[in-house]
Regions:
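Bacterial N-terminal signal peptides that target proteins for export
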Residues: 5-19
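N-terminal signal peptide c-region/cleavage motif recognized by signal peptidases
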Residues: 28-30
Length: 144
């Protein structure tokens, strides 16, 4: 029996969440996480890593399936979005982060987690603020 494309896409999406969540739960905060530059994230696929850079864009996709917020983390010296890591905060975890599309935009930070591959790009799911560490602390005004 063949599944129609929307059903197959939903099944693949669900499987990705389960696999990535399992990987995150096992390894995301391991002492063995390597530290890499966003431009090297593609080579880090399948590994747990800490990726440090600047959030070049932060977009909340309200109304889309899972209501994700996409953070594009780039190397500040080479801000090429094609060589960036996409960090994803899904809607069910969003409240833990406040309004990440405003508080994280332009921030110099590190994200730690399992790097997966999605639509030709490296991606990391963020489920808790413990996966974030600021290189330069945000001001009180930015946190409001």
């Amino acid at each position: 029996m063949l599944l129609n494309p929307p059903v197959l896409e939903k099944a693949m999406y669900s499987a990705k969440l389960v696999i990535t969540s399992a990987a995150f739960g096992l390894w995301a905060f391991s002492a063995g996480a390597v530290s890499i530059d966003p431009t090297a994230a593609m080579a880090g696929i399948g590994r747990t890593a800490t990726v440090c850079g600047v959030v070049a864009s932060a977009d909340y996709m309200v109304g889309s399936r899972a209501n994700p917020t996409f953070l594009t983390v780039v190397n500040p010296d080479q801000p090429d979005a094609k060589r960036a890591l996409t960090a994803v905060i899904y809607g069910h975890d969003r409240a833990k982060f406040g309004t990440p599309e405003t508080t994280l935009q332009g921030q110099h930070l590190c994200v730690t987690g399992y790097i997966s591959y999605f639509r030709g790009r490296p991606e990391m799911m963020l489920t808790t603020p413990r996966q974030l560490s600021y290189i330069a602390q945000p001001s009180v005004a930015q946190l409001r």
